[in-house]
Amino acid sequence: QNSYWECQELLEDILDSYQRDFPKYSERDADLKYVQLVFARTPHIVGQPFKFVAISRDIQSKYIRRGIELCHQAGVIHPVYSSHGFPLEAKFNPDRYKLLFADLGLMQRACGLNISRWISEDYRVIHQGTIAEQFVGQQILCNHYGFKSGKLYYWERQKRGSQAELDFVIDGQDAPIPI
């Protein structure tokens, strides 16, 4: 039990360390505010198609976009772009994406998710899709499976009455490979 709480404290220290480092990635004081906001909100929206209002309803999208760019440069978030064809890079939509957080452990800590409760059926049902998507995306990024551009992709169909999504697709030799 002690090691669990020590681990949670360590994760909290890492999150705090990121916050202290953000001024290094912010060219202006105004940027710092947006970087901090994006960093704080991203763990709560992992795996969801990104909407600027998920970060803030009161801040213009151009400022949030700048915060996303800076967080991505800092390596604390990673966009997963929608792509509708092959090759993925040629058919992706730079304005349609989801976000991954830096790390699954950090994500659960930032969200206040208690790992020891994951064995509870109700708790798992609520969070398992997000947790799985973060884990798989993180593994793809760590191992550089099937991508050269540094971009991750997903596929979705948004037709009325016929919605579908593949959380990740990578370039294969002759066709995209769903993950």
Give residue spans per PLM region.
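Accessory nucleic acid-recognition modules appended to NTPase machines
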Residues: 3-175
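Conserved beta3 VAIK motif of the Hanks protein kinase fold
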Residues: 179
